[in-house]
Amino acid sequence: MKGKFIVIEGIDGCGKTTQIDELSKWLPISGLLKKESKLITTREPGGSLLGKKLRRLILDNNENNKPSSLAELLLYSADRAEHVSKIILPALNNNDWVISDRFSDSTLAYQGYGRNINLEIIKNIESIVCQGASPDLTFFLEISPEESIFRRKNEIPDRIESEGIRFLERVNEGFKLIAKQKNWKVISASQNIKTISNQIKETLLNNFSNAK
């Protein structure tokens, strides 16, 4: 893989989408990309055509359509397998940069720590579906579960967002553990948008300025 793979993680409401929008404007003029390289921004679930259909199934808030925890895990895994095959690997092999709103560690946090599915089972599945794709750098935008709920109070929640605060606390603790284990760049998402954006940009410059 020749391109760069950047992932932004965090619980809902932490500002991932906002920061990816900022990066999509800045990175092409940052001097970090090679002349022939493009920037691909994507997300999970829903980064591929099949993924968009899976996203609707996964996040459907109709109680009658609620999947079991294991079925939910496998739906996310199917989404990721397609995402890696059709979007991420082709872009990286083409020397492009990929920025993804979530990747495999979200599954560890939500389905592992949140749903209490055995972590080794998840890791074994992920080792297959990721097909060797691994982030060059992961940012963790950290906010408290209470702040997450407050920020989303006027939104119509999807099925995952409708889970209670205890679930969100488990997910958040999972993210913190993973961030420490994998040496992620942790940024307080309670700061203003510009401050967070500047910290992300500075980290990218420090890590990749000599990688062209």
Curated annotation (Swiss-Prot):
- Substrates-to-products reaction catalysed: dTMP + ATP = dTDP + ADP
Q: Fetch the InterPro entries from UniProt.
A: P-loop_NTPase, Thymidylate_kin-like_dom, Thymidylate_kin_CS, Thymidylate_kinase
Cell division is among the record's keywords:
no
One BP term from GO: dTDP biosynthetic process
Q: Gene3D superfamilies in the record, alphabetically?
A: P-loop containing nucleotide triphosphate hydrolases (3.40.50.300)
Q: CDD domains given for it?
A: TMPK (cd01672)
Could you tell me one molecular function GO term of this UniProt entry? dTMP kinase activity
Q: Which domain of life is it from?
A: Bacteria
Record: residues binding ATP = 10-17
Give the UniProt keywords, A-Z: ATP-binding, Kinase, Nucleotide biosynthesis, Nucleotide-binding, Transferase
UniProt KW S-adenosyl-L-methionine keyword: no
* Pfam families per UniProt: Thymidylate_kin
Q: A GO CC term?
A: cytosol
* E.C. numbers: 2.7.4.9
- What PANTHER family does the record tag this protein with? THYMIDYLATE KINASE, UMP-CMP KINASE 2, MITOCHONDRIAL
Job of this protein? Phosphorylation of dTMP to form dTDP in both de novo and salvage pathways of dTTP synthesis.
Q: Tell me which family the UniProt entry assigns to this protein.
A: Belongs to the thymidylate kinase family.
**Protein name (record):** Thymidylate kinase
Organism this protein belongs to? Prochlorococcus marinus (strain MIT 9301)
Q: Which gene encodes it?
A: tmk
